[in-house]
Amino acid sequence: MRFSFSVLMTIILVSLFSMTSPFSFTESPKGILDRVYGNGDDEGDDDEGRGGEGNDDEGRGGEGDEGRGGDDDDDDDDERDSRSFRFNDDNRNLRRLLDSLLLQERDNDDDKQEINVEPKTYEGYGLKDEDEKSNEDFNFAAAGDFGCSENARNTVKNMEDKKPEVVLPLGDLSYQSTANCWFDVMAPLKGKIMITLGYHDVSDGEAKLDQYVKGFKIDKHYYSYDYNKVHFLVMASESNFQNGSKQFSFVKQDLEEASKNNDINWIVVTIYRPLYTSPSKHTAEESMRDLYHPLFDKYGVDLVLQAHNHNYQRTYPLTYNPEKASNPVITNGFTTGYNSNNDGVIFATIGTGGESFYGLDGRASFVATQIDRFGFLNLEVKNGNPHTTLTGTFYDNKGDEIKDYFTIKKEIK
């Protein structure tokens, strides 16, 4: 372990406060540093918590609306890396100081890696067989918040082992000033990728955004495509999505057409910010949820894949509750098997690509399972007759273990 000035100061501060402060720590300085810098033994423990719905008031007009206003990595929030620290409430100021020192150390390392890096042009990464109309079975894989660490490379390697035909990165792809490292990490999956853009992808400079736009030949940040009887709709949470916007009109028309298309068995939506979430660093994007979940119900969306919170969560099938939107209607309370013809939407948060963990502070009542592990969600489509099935399996990078499994079955059109 490398001890810089910031780390040394952290140890001193922790030691002094633990000896002299009337408040207590439940974790040693070494434990804190091990959690922050990693000792190889604590990649993330299952944390299923004590309940709650994760819809705090943070934003620009809704109970849990986060807003667009600041860089997510620089937020002041006391919830940053909650699994790394365990303090009493009265130690908030010390916690902020320790956070600042440790995060400054990480940022300094990132800056050193980014000296004189010029954005490169990458081609051939986008899905080659877009609008494929065959009836063959296939699988696709999804995760967000990759970054460029060894954790991200492990996620990509494990994805590659499952031989997906389509790969869905769900936003916040690179946390550096360019996307060079991320394209390099994703190289084994070249020709299979259809991206969703997140906060860091559109807000960290035009040069990086331009790499994505040109590399994947997307003229808008929202778009749709078909593959083997699955309709994929990619939404842009970082663009204007309000009622009356171009994106809203596009989404409404796109879903209406897909719902009437007899060649489409499944509708899958990808979006960066979560519309539903257990308590974690980020709350639900409520204004977007209240506008679009009713559309998802109306037009028969089956699955919504989202990221932003660096953990894995998967809800029961849900329909929108206009009386209390933060408490959606659970249409099927089973944890793994669903026999439904568009009776509720499953929302899966997969911010597990490899950047970091945020931890989970309890579990919302509408969440069937949640996991603090790096990994990805593999989804297998079997187009049988008279039924078709969509099976989701979350694979943990640690030993390729199965941590979640669910199947949706419905009659074909």
Regions from the language model: what does each represent?
Residues E380-T388:
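A short, structured loop/turn motif at beta-sheet edges
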Residues E27-Y37, D81-R106:
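Alpha-helical segments embedded in low-complexity/disordered contexts
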Residues N39-S82, D109-D111:
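Long, acidic low-complexity intrinsically disordered regions
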Residues M1-S24:
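Classical Sec-dependent N-terminal signal peptides that target proteins to the secretory pathway
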Residues D145, G171-D172, G198-Y199, Y272, ...:
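Active-site glycine-centered loops adjacent to acidic/histidine catalytic or metal-binding residues
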Residues G392-K403:
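Short, solvent-exposed aromatic-acidic interface loops
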Residues E105, D109-C181, S278:
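N-terminal active-site segment of His-dependent metallophosphoesterases
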Residues V117-K128, N139, E160, A179-D263, ...:
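Extended active-site neighborhood of metal-dependent phosphoesterases/phosphodiesterases
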